[in-house]
């Protein structure tokens, strides 16, 4: 299981450093910059992930109903509040969990701190002292009669196979994204966006195969980077009492892939916080990301890519709220409409 996560994680780490694939960077470029190429990379990543995921399902290699995001009933309040909290925390921390791991692989000690704090706060909300409060405010339950997926919804009301819906959505998304002139002028951006999509698909394929052929039936998952960071910390501290998981392999893969990318580009260097105020701000953002991702059942990668690739109800709502929360946080940092430190 860990090797499956490691493979996709390495691809994601390379995409972050060689392809500059970054959630917050894409939002910053779109909102404040003069280019939207990195934002367009998300369209390629999502399109490839949709085509690959629904292609796996059509070929009998993936049971969509067994995936994490389609096996839980959707709680819209959790998506909205968790997404906004995560997005805001991402902006004031300066990175999401995935981005922090990628930067940590290049020697950024600030990102090491962000990753640790986010992982711990996520586990506090997931299974620690605040888990009962979280469940009381945002209860989770198993799926009822209907699978909470957009492709399933369309297939219930229109006589069309749900796989055709998902694959068509992916093809259209890629086609529309390729209308972007800046993206077409950067073949490398198209390539690395596609690599991210392939990484997501590889996660579904591997965990489905392991679930179907392993000794114990397990949940089918793909990449996400909040709870797995906490899992990795627990494994490092108590390996005798914990098994290494897909998430642990994924976290290690991103760090190793980013390290390889930095060595290739010659960007490896040690960095640290410049002053205590910066450290305090980034720690606060990391705490918010940890709590927000657990409430929303996924981070910018977990909901924005993995959940989106199965067209879960939660994905577009959570991703939109993450973007909105990030824009609010960026405005606060850049335009200073209120103090945060």
Sequence positions of predicted segments:
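Membrane-interfacial helix-loop segments of redox and metal-homeostasis proteins
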Residues: 1-341
